[in-house]
Amino acid sequence: MTCQKFYVVLLHWEFLYVITALNLAYPTSPWRFKLFCAPPSTTDDSFLSPAGVPNNTSSLKGASEALVEAKFNSTGIYVSELSKTIFHCCFGNEQGQNCSALTGNTEGKTLASVVKPLVFRQLGVNWDIECWMKGDLTLFICHMEPLLKNPFKNYDSKVHLLYDLPEVIDDLPLPPLKDSFQTVQCNCSVRECECHVPVPRAKVNYALLMYLEITSAGVSFQSPLMSLQPMLVVKPDPPLGLRMEVTDDGNLKISWDSQTKAPFPLQYQVKYLENSTIVREAAEIVSDTSLLVDSVLPGSSYEVQVRSKRLDGSGVWSDWSLPQLFTTQDVMYFPPKILTSVGSNASFCCIYKNENQTISSKQIVWWMNLAEKIPETQYNTVSDHISKVTFSNLKATRPRGKFTYDAVYCCNEQACHHRYAELYVIDVNINISCETDGYLTKMTCRWSPSTIQSLVGSTVQLRYHRRSLYCPDNPSIRPTSELKNCVLQTDGFYECVFQPIFLLSGYTMWIRINHSLGSLDSPPTCVLPDSVVKPLPPSNVKAEITINTGLLKVSWEKPVFPENNLQFQIRYGLNGKEIQWKTHEVFDAKSKSASLPVSDLCAVYVVQVRCRRLDGLGYWSNWSSPAYTLVMDVKVPMRGPEFWRIMDGDITKKERNVTLLWKPLMKNDSLCSVRRYVVKHRTAHNGTWSQDVGNQTNLTFLWAESAHTVTVLAINSIGASLVNFNLTFSWPMSKVNAVQSLSAYPLSSSCVILSWTLSPNDYSLLYLVIEWKNLNDDDGMKWLRIPSNVNKYYIHDNFIPIEKYQFSLYPVFMEGVGKPKIINGFTKDDIAKQQNDAGLYVIVPIIISSCVLLLGTLLISHQRMKKLFWDDVPNPKNCSWAQGLNFQKPETFEHLFTKHAESVIFGPLLLEPEPVSEEISVDTAWKNKDEMVPAAMVSLLLTTPDSTRGSICISDQCNSANFSGAQSTQGTCEDECQSQPSVKYATLVSNVKTVETDEEQGAIHSSVSQCIARKHSPLRQSFSSNSWEIEAQAFFLLSDHPPNVISPQLSFSGLDELLELEGNFPEENHGEKSVYYLGVSSGNKRENDMLLTDEAGVLCPFPAHCLFSDIRILQESCSHFVENNLNLGTSGKNFVPYMPQFQSCSTHSHKIIENKMCDLTV
């Protein structure tokens, strides 16, 4: 065993010596090759690839064991015959062609391995080796697979790789020593081995020397020495980010991410499988990171893989990426989403597939948000199955809740699919405003993103490029631009600062909106920093009121920058909480001050100044710090104070003490302060002298001469007042009575009105002075100076009504003060009123308000009580049944409310109260034997008479043939002829229970039917003997109703009340009652009138020549009721019916009453 190991080591050294001496580093295909070992006598290729066996790697792997066994049998070498066998090992391709070059050299120039034939057969000698450099250029990998099945199954095998990375291999003076090689142990499994060689990134371009050493069952195999460059055998990583989408043109775009780690360009191979109506498989090589597949149809599926390799062809193909699946929808939009700006155009294309059938493009319609159909003028046909819609001059998308886009639907003529395309229209007209500071060192630009906030997922940035000098006429976006960092402020604006700046360089800038759908740019704008300067505010601002002139003078100093001519703006106002500003413009660039007129010279003014370029470019500066004026005397007082006097002492004496009183001057009069007051005296004997009283407002002096004139002067730091008031005290003038009367009337507790009359005099009246004081209080006297041309004056003070006041009126002349008019208290009437009721002004309004409230409450209560209790109570004076009754007698009420033994028939309530006009003639008896007939009562309710209009009833047309003995009278009737229809009716009530004879019935029937039969009316058949009963008949007359129309609502529903009353009234053995309706209108419409019978409401024409002119009714005991209530024999009697008209008639005595009913509308 020791000898065997020694022999293997010897072979190692021999191998290294041979390849070093002869420089036999094997230049084979470095990424994939084979290792072959064969006996020396076997030099033909049949050993490596015998006839009948395919020359490929897979065949060699599957049949290597059989090949080796067959080869040994053919050579006749047996284990018993040979104890040692020498093999030649070499590299070759799959056909082993390179091994033949080395088989002839057997004198120490080849690697010989001495093994037993049995071991040779079991281990196998053919290896498939592949080496590559990893894509990250950090690791060199060799992968080995034996061609025999399970070569290391029965032996403990080890594989090592020895390598060296010399910088220069050709100039080595000596062969490389074995110690210079580094060894790595390979990881082996049953079927494969893999060796990892770490290569520094700096040595990827060096030549790598290596060989393999395989040890198994005590036998070692060594491969020839290999030389290769790792950079040329790089195997990239598989591409990542494989994705697919339908392009705007309807093609399928396959794209992936580029490998940023690769230091060299790559080429890609794409293979895809299309499964649609036709299955298609293809593999294409491209240099870009995307591939377009055309003719994409809806409902198709694609399976795609991609791998990469160096573009120059060297290296190894990477592994295939993971397969990616993609399926197109039944309705395809391309593009599915569009992001565009306002005013631009956009187009969508669509392919619609419905139930495995592609819809023709001519059958496709487009909708916007499923609410608005897009006009067909915007449609275009791209192909038989592709429809296109175009939108022009788009407007900004208005967000609707969570939807920030417009949904565009491609629909079939019959239905729409739920899929849609998205249209985002953004207003990119963003205003960028820039401002250069006053020091001209930086420029700040601001802009608002409010118009693009609806675009979710977008980012905005400001991009710009600078021109060396000035701005171009038409700014444009350049592909090469710079990004400016902007910060969002609290006010919602972005702010970007350019520093340093070039004042005369043009900065073209725009806002770029980045989104996953694309990017949009706002219109570019060019800014010249020198044109947007905001200067520093003026400094050293001062303000003062000038002396004597009284003007507000403002001065300032111009800022250092910019050097351009500037204009200035001054604002000023009275100092206070809310300043009312006034402005003044100064356009003189050289001016540093301005004088302004002001109204109040004695007030404090606050002043500020700002500036900007005179040519209008740039911005106004900030306002300067405020400057305030000081209050000081600017002029002499405008006038002296007004003053009055108080006289003390006995008026009979020639000497009296006079106290002068005056009010301090206001600032506007003193301009602006008073240091002291001076009183000047003038008398005839003593001349003129002055008294300085300082700041006091009173002075007492002795009046001893007949005339004494005084003047009060106000003096400030400038001088004494120029205009002053004089007051002359004169004994003769004090007796001049110029005031004739004086009255005082209190208006309220704070106002009293004084009125007076003056008597004519020869003196010149200057003014009047009013004095008043409270006689019960020691507050002192108050006074007012008023003009001389008024005769009443309102005094505003705190007056107590129960106090007593004294009012005095002094006339003041140029010669002196006249005699006053003095009254103690108010006018007498007012005094008594105030004394009786001091709180009159408070009590009276309270009393008036209480009375109004009480009156309103009573009126409301009265109306409610009347509505609840007295609304339905009739007035006896307006009721027909109360006519002629004396309600002063007790028996009237007893008879009125006595219960009758038998029931009577009630008529219906009238629809409205109306006066009655009637014309009735009564005969005392019948001339034939039929006098004894049942009695009846008639109550005629007709229209209200109108004295202005009348009508004559011609009785000849209405005489009855059956009553020849009756003599008719001729009378007049009156009609109101109203425009609206009204209801009139007459009710016949009788308590007779017996049935009249046929003859009696015929008499009445004939009198009625005669008028109806004049024109052969069809109503004649309706009036049979059975249908006409004398017991109770009712005729309803409708006047002034439109021709040929009878209101069914009035005819039926209105009379249902009558029928209800008759039907519900308890009466034994009472026969059926009949109700008949008569239509009455004007004479010129009579031929069109209608009659409504009691049979099924049939409408029949009414006779034009007669209106039931003769109706005879028997009556006896109720004649007094007719006479009293109807005033027989009279005409024009009016009454207002309120209750149903009825009366019960006895059967003991009867009278014949002939009632002439005339047409009231003739």
Curated annotation (Swiss-Prot):
Segments in the Cytoplasmic topological domain: 861-1162
Sequence segments annotated as region (Required for STAT3 phosphorylation): 896-904
Tissues where this protein is expressed: Isoform B is expressed in kidney, liver, lung, ovary, spleen and uterus. Increased level in uterus during gestation. Isoform A and isoform C are predominantly expressed in cerebral microvessels and choroid plexus, with lower levels in cortex, cerebellum and hypothalamus but also liver and lung. Isoform F is expressed at high levels in brain, liver and spleen and less in stomach, kidney, thymus, heart, lung and hypothalamus.
One Pfam family named in its UniProt record: Lep_receptor_Ig
Motif WSXWS motif positions after renumbering to this chain: 620-624
GO CC annotations on file: basolateral plasma membrane; external side of plasma membrane; extracellular space; receptor complex
Cited function: Receptor for hormone LEP/leptin. On ligand binding, mediates LEP central and peripheral effects through the activation of different signaling pathways such as JAK2/STAT3 and MAPK cascade/FOS. In the hypothalamus, LEP acts as an appetite-regulating factor that induces a decrease in food intake and an increase in energy consumption by inducing anorexinogenic factors and suppressing orexigenic neuropeptides, also regulates bone mass and secretion of hypothalamo-pituitary-adrenal hormones.
Record text about domains: The WSXWS motif appears to be necessary for proper protein folding and thereby efficient intracellular transport and cell-surface receptor binding.
Protein name: Leptin receptor
Organism whose genome encodes this protein: Rattus norvegicus
Annotated gene: Lepr
